[in-house]
């Protein structure tokens, strides 16, 4: 039964994506206007093939032998845990007339899914998933037959799904009602805090074993085949009592209408309900050339509309509250990823017209130039800059909060904070924040994974406690007046138990045991975390690097600007994975530093060795990745976040 349930879930899950046949409209065009979320994958198979053939990453890391080895390792893990073996998986597919190649072919075509949210007067809002894929006539027939066979096999089981064949919009539809069974937890109380010992846990488990199972709702699934396309709808109904009520029936009828409209629209004409989303200037400007991987679209207005209706508040009150935040005129959000001319690109856009207001007014502050400061060394793997006057943002938030109904209480809180700041630092909170300047710099150094693991092993043997932080980060601010920050660090030193600030290369500061270090000097405030980061950062501020040791003077900013023009932006970043290998390189370094004995579960040690052998070597990873860059900008139409990475050819 477990394997049957798994294959049913797989078959239905595969139907959560989309595709378009020539005779039918694209399925996304058939979605209703109250669609809150949609994801489309135009062709994963072709995209995968392109990455394998045109990038070194694909040729090496995604090569057939490595993928086969990975599949074998995963199957080995499942087999060791008694879940399923590779042979059992293949037998399960064959039993239902399917092969692995049938599932792989599904990914070659377009697929997608969506979520519809609909308000219902005096009833729970209806959430329904609509999905589509295009496996072709043969593939769709196989999947539908497999689902039917599994439903027939489970017909005699307790709480078995109930299948009903119906007709909607002139199409045959298989409707399935799957009971939702939950334990009746009335009278089963959790132990009070401090009483959750082993005995209490055993007693709780025993009470749960004896709890009565009851039917609390049903999940309805609708499946139809249309010209080689598999269309699926699914939604949940809940009962007011175990026997059900009229609300459950009303929910089913609403789902039937939604799915019928979805089917009918495939052969219809006219403008798609979501066409207006794609016409929003911010969304249209986020289009990407090349081969797309995925497009995700969210319509917050649909969710807001449902929540408004559920709140019972009048529209004016709701709009006023949204305006305070600054999202009363928010539009759609889109996320796109693609590969084009040796570059992996991603963009996220949100319709949020200028001028922004409410809390989001802070996003309209002037932006600094996107550039790397002189003190950043070539050793840094990632550099980021946030352009924002925190003091001005603080004042904006304070002004808005003071205007609210609880304004007097908020004013008292701000007054206390300012008085404390004046007493300790000689200036108010806003002045302290603005004193940091508008450029907030963040530096990421390559992690020292091997060193940290070695320390952890030694500490485990000796019983000593040591810091095992592998991350190596720094945040730097250029400040005009060091006085308030020296006083602030003095207070921090007292709290840390040291009492006095320490001297380091002409800087004053404090090191938090097992944590970060904070230092002030030479017109800069530095926060550092990780072995050697403080010393390197302070030295670079004292004597800025030049030539090959300088990130600013290297080819990294130039190559990054070729990916995305380095215009003034709210956020800016560059990264260099040519040496570190990015996330894959970190995984490789972790695997190389680990030993089988580091894994407590003995049964997993063999799997670890197998997975370790599958990772590319340092030599294989040379030239696998290149330069990356990010930009976060506010346009007249909204927010635009862009990223791009070099993906060198084999």
How would you name each of these model-derived features?
Residues 134-139, 235-239, 479-483, 530-533:
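Helix N-cap motif at beta-to-alpha junctions
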Residues 1-7:
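Bacterial N-terminal signal peptides that target proteins for export
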Residues 463-482:
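Loop/turn-rich, solvent-exposed surfaces of beta-rich toroidal or solenoidal domains
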Residues 478, 616-650:
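C-terminal regions of mature proteins
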Residues 168-188, 507-534, 612-625, 635:
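Short, intrinsically disordered low-complexity segments
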